[in-house]
From Swiss-Prot:
One GO term describing the cellular component: plasma membrane
Native source species: Pseudomonas putida (strain ATCC 700007 / DSM 6899 / JCM 31910 / BCRC 17059 / LMG 24140 / F1)
Protein name according to UniProt: Probable potassium transport system protein Kup
Recorded name of the encoding gene: kup
Lineage of the species this protein comes from: Bacteria, Pseudomonadati, Pseudomonadota, Gammaproteobacteria, Pseudomonadales
UniProt function note: Transport of potassium into the cell. Likely operates as a K(+):H(+) symporter.
HAMAP family on file: Kup
């Protein structure tokens, strides 16, 4: 009986585990694969109608299909699924998480470490550009299908797209927790539809399956030496969204993402591309919109509706990714602090950042109005995608060689292969800068300038504040000689340096002539890892005479809740009773000068960013009625 019972329990647990695995796989399909899953809407259309000079004939179609297939296998299956997904930072992925890993890997090489930070900032900057282009091109390409169903509706494509996109951004502040549960099933339906359409097309012209032979891709370069590399600028559209596999790893883990790719997403994409190719072999004129023309007439309107939902989901994933990237960058010190609003009481990762949301919305609206069609926007798309991919490869190279300690004989050939292919795709997109690709370059350049100015400005600000700082032991010795009047309670002074006296403490002594019975010098340390366990959260050191030094460690995915963290500090003599604790903050006003370190115009830019950044009070969740801010002017 006991055996029967244990078998029953084991079977129940096994079913639960299987159910959870399927649930994670479906959820991953809904969040991770929206972008790459909607690429069939416009990729082959752009290849054959984008002015590349590719003929819609037997050799041209098979050559392009072979290029798309082997690009998917090399870049997504081999590079991202088998290698990049292994470069997790304690389970987290994405540009900032990888940059933090690369910083750790190059800690012993300052110049190389600086290069890794630059690559990370470039990758992050291009991702923000991509976050504007993806919603615009995806929704436009979906709505354009209506023009095939109704005559004379083409002039409504832009207004309808704008309504859909603006509505998407307006609902962000309310969260997408409830409707988010539908994303997975809708995207699974989308991929099943892609596969079914592909099978239907292939059945009409099975010879298209010859494109599985990579020889057709090689032959395309031989026959078309003039456009061979240039066409990669359109082929790369089939890879848009590959970076999402890595960026969303923290939500689902490597295995569900990999399984979803090989079980559902890759087969559906390949079938659909080959189905479109089969249609083009039969009807070259279908190149004007091979995706929608692949569908039977009765299925066109339902397909437009499903495609619109799929592109909205793809856009949602990119917007959420921008919020997540911003939070990580703030914690790592690359972006000024912003107000972060949690939109779910259950899911910590569901956040909303108003400044990012409205900036993205304005960018998307301008793109839709300015370009007017998915074909015109395709030129801008490739630059952002390939640039981000290239930066990811450079960052993971440092991790593989210096952190993982892979043997160079094994790692170098693989990395050279990645860099060669990424370099080809990026080079193919460089000429597109004059055709619309300038947008992500300019947007990325502005964001890089802001992030690098903020990072450098904060470093200089700390250096200026540290100049002439009074060492803490000397200060304690002086008050032993001339003890000030001390009042009951605990004073917490936030400071970047834990071994010197904060300016706020000196100002308090100067103006109020008193000192609290307990004085805590608190330094918040941002780690290059996503989360710090509670038992590693704090370090406490007692100096005597009521002085304590406390270090609080937070990861870039942690909520920096200082009062909650201080409750964990266990020391008999240290009391953090909320109503007896006062927090003293310094509020620096920066004055740009001709001092060495930063040009005057960048100094003014940093001063503007600092003035508009969220202060320590909100960022560290300090109680409003227990905070005193003391101002000081600093020249940089």
């Amino acid at each position: 009986m006991v055996q029967a019972s244990s078998h029953a329990e084991g079977g129940h647990e096994g079913k639960q585990g299987a159910s959870r695995s399927v649930g994670l796989l479906v959820a991953a399909v809904g969040v991770v694969y929206g972008d790459i899953g909607t690429s069939p809407l416009y990729t082959l259309k752009e290849v054959f109608t984008g002015g590349y000079g590719v003929s819609v004939n037997h050799d041209g179609v098979l050559g392009i299909l072979s290029l798309i297939l082997w690009s998917l296998l090399w870049v997504v299956s081999f590079k991202y699924v088998m290698f990049i997904l292994r470069a997790d930072n304690q389970g987290e992925g994405g540009t900032m998480a990888l940059t933090a890993l690369a910083r750790r890997a190059t800690a012993a090489y300052p110049r190389l470490r600086t290069l890794m930070v630059i690559c990370g900032l470039i990758g992050a900057s291009l991702f923000y550009g991509d976050s504007m282009i993806t919603p615009a091109v995806s929704v436009l390409s979906a709505v354009e299908g209506m023009g095939l169903a109704f005559d004379g509706i083409d002039h409504w494509v832009v207004p309808i797209s704008l309504v859909v996109l603006v509505a998407l951004f307006l609902v962000q502040q309310h969260g997408t927790e409830k409707i988010g549960k539908l994303f997975g099933p809708i995207m699974v339906t989308w991929f099943v539809a892609l596969g079914a359409l592909g099978v239907h097309g292939i059945s009409q012209s099975p010879e298209v399956l010859k494109a599985f032979n990579p020889g057709w891709a090689v032959n395309f370069f031989v026959v078309h030496p003039g456009i061979g590399v240039a066409i990669l600028g359109a082929v790369v559209l089939a890879l848009t969204g590959a970076e999402a596999l890595y960026a969303d790893m923290g939500h689902f883990g490597r295995k569900p993402i990999a399984r979803a790719w090989f079980i559902l997403v890759l087969p559906a994409l390949v079938l659909n591309y080959f189905g479109q190719g089969a249609l083009l072999l039969q009807n070259p004129e279908a190149a004007r919109n091979p995706f929608y023309l692949l569908a039977p007439g009765w299925a066109l309107l339902p397909l437009v509706g499903l495609a619109t939902m799929a592109t909205v989901i793809a856009s949602q994933a990119v917007i959420s990714g921008a919020f997540s990237l911003t939070r990580q960058a703030i914690q790592l010190g690359y972006i000024p602090r912003m107000q972060i609003q949690h939109t779910s009481s259950d899911e910590q990762g569901q956040i909303y950042i108003g400044a990012v949301n409205w900036t993205l919305m304005v960018g998307v609206v301008l793109l839709v109005i300015g370009f007017g069609s998915s074909g015109a926007l395709a030129a801008a798309y490739g630059v952002a995608v390939t640039g981000t991919m290239l930066m990811t490869t450079i960052l993971v190279s440092a991790v593989m060689l210096l952190l993982w300690k892979w043997p160079p004989l094994l790692a170098v050939p693989i990395l050279v292969g990645f860099l060669f292919v990424d370099g080809l795709f990026f080079a193919a997109n460089v000429p597109k800068i004059v055709q619309g690709g300038a947008f992500p370059v300019l947007a990325g350049g502005v964001l890089y300038l802001l992030m690098s100015t903020w990072k450098r400005g904060k470093q200089i600000l700390v250096e200026r504040i540290d100049e002439g700082a009074l060492p803490l032991p000397l200060f304690i010795s002086s008050i032993r000689i001339q003890p000030p009047h001390r009042v009951e309670g605990t004073a917490v002074f936030l400071t970047a340096r834990s071994d010197a006296v904060p300016h706020a403490l000196l100002h308090n002594m100067l103006h109020n002539q008193v000192l609290h019975s307990q004085v805590v010098l608190l330094t918040v340390v941002s780690e290059d890892r996503p989360r710090v366990p509670e038992h590693e959260r704090f370090e406490v050191e007692a100096y005597g005479d009521g002085f304590f030094r406390v270090l609080l460690h937070f990861g870039f995915m942690d909520e920096p809740d200082v009062p909650a963290a201080l409750k964990l500090c266990h020391l008999d003599d240290l009391d953090f009773t909320p109503m007896r604790t006062t927090y003293f903050l310094s509020r620096e006003t920066v004055i740009a000068s001709r001092l060495e370190g930063m040009s005057r115009w960048r100094g003014n830019l940093f001063a503007f960013l600092l003035k508009n950044a969220n202060g320590n009070l909100r960022f560290f969740n300090l109680p409003l009625n227990r905070v005193i801010e003391l101002g000081t002017q600093v020249e940089i």
